UniProtKB/Swiss-Prot annotation:
Species lineage: Bacteria, Bacillati, Cyanobacteriota, Cyanophyceae, Acaryochloridales
Enzyme class: transferase
Function, as annotated: Catalyzes the synthesis of activated sulfate.
Name of the protein in its database record: Adenylyl-sulfate kinase
Residues annotated as the enzyme's active site: S118
Catalytic activity: adenosine 5'-phosphosulfate + ATP = 3'-phosphoadenylyl sulfate + ADP + H(+)
């Protein structure tokens, strides 16, 4: 039995895994970037406008000279989470992975925006608890189910109503709205520009961006 094999097997246990601390800290990366890093977690039903809002906020922040990245719910299913289904277990693991990636990107010094339904409150709180206090900002894109169904360009709600899609959030799987999000954006009442302004205003008030 080779030494390499022994190392690979014992390293699977947590007590044999060491954390290697980089000499280049997050604070130094933030200083180089010229701004603080953090995570904006957009959550809401399918059709609530999460992706559109996240990408538009990113564009505005980019124009202000910020280093940014959007983790989009559909995009990660093409690679990082392509092995996961849409069962409750699969969704939990999907959010866990995204939370870890978002945390790593924040450590790099980026402003990270995530656009995921992330239907379960406990999963979102688990991600929040992995972040330093104040670095996870939950933005609830609030909209009625009726409005989401009216916006349903993919036809997914219609398929879920017909029983062709199982465990679809809002139809036969619950969405647990945030209890104390940092911001609620009613995308049913507000225009896209008004929604973007609400996000930027929150960041400005917290000293996280200069408008």
């Amino acid at each position: 039995m080779s030494a390499n094999f022994l190392i690979q097997t014992v390293s699977n246990t947590p007590e044999n895994i060491l954390w290697h601390q980089s000499t280049v800290t997050r604070a130094r990366r933030e200083q180089l970037n010229g701004h603080k890093s953090y995570v904006l977690w957009f959550t809401g039903l399918s059709g609530a406008g999460k992706s559109r809002l996240a990408h538009t906020v990113e564009e505005r922040l980019h124009r202000l000279g910020c280093r940014t990245f959007v983790l989009d719910g559909d995009n990660v299913r093409h690679g990082l989470c392509s092995d996961l289904d849409f069962s409750e277990v699969g969704r939990k693991e999907n959010i866990r992975r995204i939370g870890e990636v978002a945390k790593l990107m924040m450590e790099v010094g980026l402003i990270v925006m995530t656009a995921f339904i992330s239907p379960f409150r406990a999963d979102r709180e688990a991600v929040r608890n992995r972040m330093p206090y104040g670095d996870f900002l939950e933005i609830y894109c609030q909209v009625s189910l009726e409005a989401c169904e009216a916006r349903d360009v993919k036809g997914l709600y219609k398929k879920a109503r017909a029983g062709q899609i199982k465990n679809y959030t809002g139809i036969d799987s619950a969405y647990e709205a945030p209890l104390k999000p940092e911001l609620v954006v009613n995308t049913e009442c507000l225009t896209l520009e008004e929604s973007v302004s609400a996000v930027l205003r929150m960041l400005h008030e917290r000293g996280m961006v200069v408008q």
